[in-house]
């Protein structure tokens, strides 16, 4: 008993001393770096001052803070850990004839006075230089200030042309009612009315039979990283013949107009990307007809108009436990605010009623890893929605295909409630050459899963679908003008339209001119 009391007293004293030590330890650092610094300190509690300074600097350099300075000092019993990452200084832009100087700096995410991260700067520069009409040659000029911190000035020499970027893409992500193939032709135009705005125009069709599907789309993005806004509109027209069997001879035709607005407004106090409000609305005006027999007798004619406001929160965070990657999340809801017409809803489903709302959630983590000496990265994604009542088809969660569960048909299953998950490992990019084109190719391996279910008395007891798959593929970029993706998924669960182990290939290629 005496031994137990002594041990307890010792632990209590150690706890008090630990708390006292923490109270006399302070970190002086830009707010953006403090989460990263504290994560490191949590994982390295027993380092000496010299070891702490050296190890933390090496860690931050690996995180991209090339010019970081770390020092540990003690004054009057207080230990101060000071981190000076270096900051973005003066930027000089020259040579640009078409693109605005502020727009170029915004694309490079250059903001004077903010911490300088070389990895982020390199990625932003590479992303901008992928466009045919602009090339930015960067010359960094670090200088040391009176307090020892590095100020990174930069000269940007720009060669630009008229900022037009035509593109064409081919993919097999169409639904099974059509040929399954899609061709899209489009044009992206920068700085139409203001710096850093983009106008995108595109036309999509089924290349096997354009009469089965044609779609027009336009979007205009404007604003800055402090307040990004987008307006969009489109129209689609489709007609599918013999959708059930040639003997029944049932054709379905439909057309629809849609338009909307979306915006993202950062509200993070420390890092603007850490928290933001997203909001907007969509307007849908849909019409569909069903024809029967060789004479194409009209059997059904439906119209549906929906106005769908939405609001939510989204954010970004540094992965915990000393990991080097980032995490992303969003939480929001979509509703018709009781503006729908019950008569139109009842034609689609007698159980549908206006006033529905749909909560949605998404979560993703990206983390660089090294496996068996090979560098790569892991990406985990999860998104879903929930509803306790039946929803219009356009609001149901879909699974299957390249965007959710690979190995299955595109948008094979729908549900009022559903989720999809993806775990993907990507290897380091490798340089290669195909048909005389130089580029980079990256191998990927994945596991996908998804589940949807429907609500209401019209839904059967087993009106739910689950999917699982694994697979591999490659993604590549050639001459900064062509992107290619080739992925093969193997289903691990039977569905109504896809048997287990019946592998499916997902392909897409995009050319920019």
Task: Give the positions of each predicted feature.
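Outer-membrane beta-barrel initiation region
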Residues: 49-53, 58, 64, 69, ...
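C-terminal outer-membrane beta-barrel translocator/porin domains of Gram-negative envelope proteins
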Residues: 294-449, 453-455, 499, 507
